[in-house]
Amino acid sequence: SDRLVGSEMCIRDRYNLLSNDQNYHFSYEILKEVGLSSNKIFNAFKSFRGLEFRQQIIFSDKRKLIINDSKSTNYHSLIAALKKYKDIILICGGQIKSNNISILDDSLGNIKKVIIIGEESNTFHKYFQSKVTTVYVQSLDKAVVEMSKFMKTNTDFNTFLFSPGAASFDQYNNFEERGRHFNKLISKLSK
């Protein structure tokens, strides 16, 4: 039987592949069942670029990886991102959907710094302040400025992860608008 080998596929790079491995295997089995050839399936997988704002890689080089996970609107999606990356500078915050922030406890090992934005920043600040370096900046614009400062003063590899873990309605109409704003701010950094 055909085997799906992760190294044969790529939606953008290996980071996204890791989070989608189960989805690929499931999709592969369904598509084989309806009669598509392995070759057609693999070609489709290779050309698939993933969905916007779902751990979307915005930029990557030897020193940094910038990820837009604006779809992260609750703690569970934030946990998924935190467990996946290392050397994280996290931008989080917004309107919290749950008071049970302690469910993040087992997911903090890879965080170097937290930049907090949004309406309910006190909850995030109280939670993170004794665990990791935190800074509160209110807006996404200011968070990206803070991120840029960190980039300029730090030569180690870092993952800059925008994974709010909260809803966007305090400052945006939806997570898509918030995600587009983040991408726009990042594109200005390179100019």
Language-model features, listed with the residues they occupy:
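Single conserved hydrophobic/aromatic residue that forms the stacking wall/gate
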Residues: S1-I11
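Nucleotide phosphate-binding/pyrophosphate-handling subdomain across enzymes
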Residues: N16-I111
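Short glycine-rich anion-binding loops that position phosphate/pyrophosphate groups of nucleotides
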Residues: T73, G94-K97, E120, L161, ...
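Short active-site-adjacent structural elements
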Residues: Y75-H76, N99-N100, T123-K126, S168-Y172
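Hydrophobic, well-ordered secondary-structure elements that form the walls
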Residues: L90, V114, F162, R178
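C-terminal helical cap/extension that packs against the catalytic core
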Residues: I101-T159
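Glycine/aspartate-rich loop-and-adjacent alpha/beta segment that forms the canonical ThDP
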Residues: P164-K191
